Amino acid sequence: MPSARDILQQGLDRLGSPEDLASRIDSTLLSPRATEEDVRNLVREASDYGFRCAVLTPVYTVKISGLAEKLGVKLCSVIGFPLGQAPLEVKLVEAQTVLEAGATELDVVPHLSLGPEAVYREVSGIVKLAKSYGAVVKVILEAPLWDDKTLSLLVDSSRRAGADIVKTSTGVYTKGGDPVTVFRLASLAKPLGMGVKASGGIRSGIDAVLAVGAGADIIGTSSAVKVLESFKSLV
């Protein structure tokens, strides 16, 4: 793994401007305390700052879809969040509901404890549905929980299932946005042609730069404006 200094420099080299960083940020609101007005404000911020998309729960994805369409903000909904331990049939209903409402991306939590082959079967079903809508599928792997061999198998299962991107963590149980975790996941996913989303504990511009330097293509954060504003002091 490169040194922290090298990772930081790589991140700065890849992020030429605040606009570059904004275009990589999935601005996220998944708090149980979130109100509809909170979500509306997040979508407005995503429009104002040019964030990549807004990541919401299924219920708010549906409720807010009209505003998002009006403002030109892409919506991503979590599926099976946060444990992933719902039957596939339930996840497919969730996915169908948000896709019909206009979501263009899904952040899916599979039932990881069932093992890589079960993850393959589950993600395959969700990908098949998502692709019929032209939607992007990201698979959340809770990378810090697994040894390298298991994580490699989970990444490969996601690829074989047709997912586009693997994501470090939900941010609920592990803080997967650190450069070590991102580098581990990117080292496995990038050779397979998959994108990498870093999420979990990214709250500053430095955090975002380190994640990108370690191999992240996308940054997931519930502190999107703070991250972007603090990044401006670095460039």
From Swiss-Prot:
Of which family is this protein a member?
A: Belongs to the DeoC/FbaB aldolase family. DeoC type 1 subfamily.
Q: Which residues form the active site?
A: 107, 167, 197
**Keyword Cell cycle applies:** no
Under catalytic activity, the entry for this protein gives:
2-deoxy-D-ribose 5-phosphate = D-glyceraldehyde 3-phosphate + acetaldehyde
Q: How does activity depend on pH?
A: Optimum pH is 6.5. Is extremely stable over a wide pH range: upon heating at 50 degrees Celsius for 60 minutes, the enzyme does not lose activity at pH 4.5-11.0.
Main function: Catalyzes a reversible aldol reaction between acetaldehyde and D-glyceraldehyde 3-phosphate to generate 2-deoxy-D-ribose 5-phosphate.
User: Where does the record place it?
Assistant: Cytoplasm
* Disulfide pairings: none
The cross-references to Gene3D superfamilies, in alphabetical order and at most eight, read: Aldolase class I
Q: What is this protein called?
A: Deoxyribose-phosphate aldolase
Pathway the protein takes part in:
Carbohydrate degradation; 2-deoxy-D-ribose 1-phosphate degradation; D-glyceraldehyde 3-phosphate and acetaldehyde from 2-deoxy-alpha-D-ribose 1-phosphate: step 2/2
Oligomeric form and interacting partners:
Homotetramer.
Gene Ontology CC terms: cytoplasm
EC number(s) on file: 4.1.2.4
**Gene assigned in the entry:** deoC
Pfam families linked to this entry: DeoC (PF01791)
Its biotechnological use is: Its high stability makes the enzyme a potential candidate to be used as a synthetic catalyst in practical application.
General remark: The enzyme is also highly resistant to organic solvents such as ethanol, methanol, N,N-dimethylformamide, and Me(2)SO at 50 degrees Celsius. Loss of activity is not observed in the presence of these reagents even at a concentration as high as 40%.
Task: Write the record's keywords in alphabetical order, separated by commas.
Answer: Cytoplasm, Lyase, Schiff base
Temperature dependence of the activity comes to: Extremely thermostable. Retains full activity upon heating at 100 degrees Celsius for 10 minutes and at 80 degrees Celsius for 60 minutes.
GO biological process, alphabetically ordered: 2-deoxyribose 1-phosphate catabolic process; carbohydrate catabolic process; carbohydrate metabolic process; deoxyribonucleotide catabolic process; protein tetramerization
- Select a single GO molecular function from the record's annotations and give it: deoxyribose-phosphate aldolase activity
